[in-house]
Structures are given as C-alpha cells and as structure tokens.
Amino acid sequence: MINYSPKRSDEPIWWGLFGAGGVWFAMITPVTVLLMGILLPLHGFGVVDIGYDKVYAFVSHPIGGAFTVLSLSLPMWHAMHRVHHGLHDLQIHLGTVGKYACYLAAALVTVLATVWVIQLS
C-alpha cells in the first residue's frame, strides 16, 4: 500500500551538512593546513612570502572570507552530527534536546565565524 502522506523529516538537512563537512574536512582542510600552516610560512615554494597582511587581505576578500567561514563551519557541522549519533550509539538518549544542542553548537560556530569575517572586511 502506498502512503500518500509521508512523514516529514529534518534529517536530510543534517545529513547534507554532515556530508558537506566530511568532504570539506577530508579534501580541503589537509591542503589548507599544509599550505597555510607549513609550506608557505616556511617559504616552501620559494615564491610567496606570506605574512599577516597577506592573510588578512585574503580573509578580507569575499572569496577568502567565504573560504574561511566554510573551513570553520562545515567541519563543525560534521563533528556535531557525529557527536549526536555517537551519543545515540552509546545508549545516551537525549532526544530532541541533545539533537538540537549539537546542531545549535554548530550553528553558533557558523554565526561567529561569519560575524568575525564580516568584521574583518
């Protein structure tokens, strides 16, 4: 029998943010840490002298600001989704309070990162 009025769920939103955060954390974050944290400050390429003013200019640019916000917020959404489901796997059932506490923490990081980047520009 076909159910013509299926139950609505907010789970696809959280799974979408979880997936985006996981991909970002696996593909983009290691390259960012390698370049911005190790190679460029140590003059690994010998062509770019990176300093505070250049990083500030990058983050102040709209594309750099968006990159910074995504680098901070998407992995946080991924982590909080893992925490939420990890608590469930450990038989710690907090219900919707735990669910929204985890996602509220990720939303708070997103808002704070956005405000920080906007204040820089």
Curated annotation (Swiss-Prot):
Coiled-coil residues: none
Primary location: membrane
Keywords: Cell inner membrane, Cell membrane, Membrane, Transmembrane, Transmembrane helix
Pfam families found in the cross-reference section: Fumarate_red_D
Keyword Cell membrane in annotation: yes
Compartments where located: Cell inner membrane
An annotated Gene Ontology molecular function: succinate dehydrogenase activity
Membrane topology, record value: Multi-pass membrane protein
GO process annotations (BP): fumarate metabolic process
Protein transport keyword on record: no
GO cellular component labels: fumarate reductase complex; plasma membrane
Membrane spanning residue stretches: 22-42, 57-77, 100-120
InterPro entries found in the cross-reference section: Fumarate_red_D, SQR/QFR_C/D
NCBIfam families, per database record: PRK05470.1-1
Function statement: Anchors the catalytic components of the fumarate reductase complex to the cell membrane, binds quinones.
HAMAP family: Fumarate_red_D (MF_00709)
Similarity field: Belongs to the FrdD family.
Assembly mode: Part of an enzyme complex containing four subunits: a flavoprotein (FrdA), an iron-sulfur protein (FrdB), and two hydrophobic anchor proteins (FrdC and FrdD).
Stated name of the protein: Fumarate reductase subunit D
Lineage: Bacteria, Pseudomonadati, Pseudomonadota, Gammaproteobacteria, Alteromonadales
